[in-house]
């Protein structure tokens, strides 16, 4: 496969298959959960995922994308959510998959969620950054966005950049450029690791646990017949952080980041990965 397999089509027709303006009815499939995932309105704007002791639930986009901007508003499980993981992510199939993650790790009542971000290329991740958010993500809906283009991946929360992962393939750092991905969301149990490394277990007396998603929106290069078809006016395709964006991101990281693989010298005693320097 060529390194760039996308087509830029300067046609309005391309936009009709490359931009999704958010209907859970039209654009996603609840692909597991046996009824625990539900769409709540005729317009397809609000969806819930639930978890009980028998099963969690999840949905996936109907289309695959090679590059795109995906965002959704989420309201997380309130109260004692220890052992639960609520997600919004991009992923390709297979054993050498690519993946871009937002994962929200639950906690006991009165303690903050951990927002876990990661990037996988060809099945290899280990690029974790984690944050404690500056608001209660269970009280109201907040907007989470992944922008993925050939130069970088940008994670934003309520429009504020919290992480930028650059394409450093020229330095030998893998970057997802070749495999189309679907968008996924899920609510599932991971009590063996999710909360304080597995020390806090899921309190099933609080089940069912429910998270809400609304205003799903994807602007992406849709994978069609082996090519990625992009609209002509995709500003996200060349998006980067300006000086103000960099300043805002560094401010969030200095105040709210609780783990950065680039700073973990015990994990990398021979030196941190090259993208960290």
UniProtKB/Swiss-Prot annotation:
Any one Gene Ontology cellular component term annotated for this protein: apoplast
Any one Gene Ontology molecular-function term assigned to this protein's record: hydrolase activity, hydrolyzing O-glycosyl compounds
Q: What induces it?
A: By auxin.
Q: Which reaction does it catalyse?
A: breaks a beta-(1->4) bond in the backbone of a xyloglucan and transfers the xyloglucanyl segment on to O-4 of the non-reducing terminal glucose residue of an acceptor, which can be a xyloglucan or an oligosaccharide of xyloglucan
Q: Which cysteines are joined by disulfide bonds?
A: 221-230, 262-276
Signal peptide positions (record): 1-21
The residues that the database entry marks as glycosylated are 107
Q: Which residues bind xyloglucan?
A: 103, 116-118, 126-128, 192-193, 197, 267
Superkingdom, according to UniProt? Eukaryota
User: According to UniProt, where does the site described as Important for catalytic activity lie?
Assistant: 101
Which PROSITE patterns does the entry mention?
Answer: GH16_1 (PS01034), GH16_2 (PS51762)
Q: Which SUPFAM superfamilies match?
A: Concanavalin A-like lectins/glucanases
pH influence on activity: Optimum pH is 7.0.
Listed under GO biological process in this entry are: cell division; cell wall biogenesis; cell wall organization; cellular response to auxin stimulus; xyloglucan metabolic process
Task: Tell me its EC number(s), please.
Answer: 2.4.1.207
- In this chain the GH16 domain maps to 22-213
| Keywords carried by this UniProt record | Apoplast, Cell wall, Cell wall biogenesis/degradation, Disulfide bond, Glycoprotein, Glycosidase, Hydrolase, Secreted, Signal, Transferase
- Tissue-wise expression: Root specific.
Q: Which CDD domains match?
A: GH16_XET (cd02176)
Pfam short name (any one): Glyco_hydro_16
Name the family. Belongs to the glycosyl hydrolase 16 family. XTH group 2 subfamily.
- Biological role stated in the UniProt entry: Possesses xyloglucan endotransglucosylase (XET) activity in vitro. Does not possess xyloglucan endohydrolysis (XEH) activity. Cleaves and religates xyloglucan polymers, an essential constituent of the primary cell wall, and thereby participates in cell wall construction of growing tissues. Involved in cell proliferation in the tissue reunion process of wounded inflorescence stems. Maybe a downstream target of NAC071 as a consequence of auxin action in wounded stems.
**Identification of the protein by name:** Xyloglucan endotransglucosylase/hydrolase protein 19
- Say which species the protein is native to: Arabidopsis thaliana
Gene coding for it: XTH19
């Amino acid at each position: 496969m060529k390194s760039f397999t996308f087509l830029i089509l300067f046609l309005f027709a391309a936009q009709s298959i490359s931009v999704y303006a958010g209907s859970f009815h039209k654009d996603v499939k609840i692909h597991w959960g046996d009824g625990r995932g539900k769409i709540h309105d005729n317009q397809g704007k609000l969806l819930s995922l639930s978890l009980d002791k028998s099963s969690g639930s999840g949905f996936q986009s109907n289309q695959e994308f090679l590059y795109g901007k995906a965002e959704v508003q989420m309201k997380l499980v309130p109260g004692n959510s220890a052992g639960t993981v609520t997600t919004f992510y991009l992923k390709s199939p297979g054993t050498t998959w690519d993946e871009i993650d937002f994962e929200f790790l639950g906690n006991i009542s009165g303690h903050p969620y951990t927002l876990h971000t990661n990037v996988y290329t060809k099945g290899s991740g280990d690029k974790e950054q984690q944050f404690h958010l500056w608001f209660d993500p269970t009280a109201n809906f907040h907007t989470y966005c992944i922008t993925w283009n050939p130069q970088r991946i940008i994670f934003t929360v309520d429009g504020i950049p919290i992480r930028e992962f650059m394409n450093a393939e020229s330095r030998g750092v893998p970057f997802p450029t070749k495999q189309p991905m679907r968008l996924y969301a899920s609510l599932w149990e991971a009590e063996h690791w999710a909360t304080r490394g597995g020390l806090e277990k899921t309190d099933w007396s609080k089940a069912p646990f429910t998270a809400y998603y609304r205003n799903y929106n994807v602007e992406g290069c849709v994978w069609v017949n082996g090519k990625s078809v992009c609209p002509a006016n995709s500003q996200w395709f060349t998006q980067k952080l300006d000086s103000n964006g960099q300043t805002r991101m560094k401010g969030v990281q200095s105040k709210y980041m609780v783990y950065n693989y680039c700073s973990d010298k015990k994990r990398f005693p021979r030196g941190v990965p090259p993208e960290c320097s």
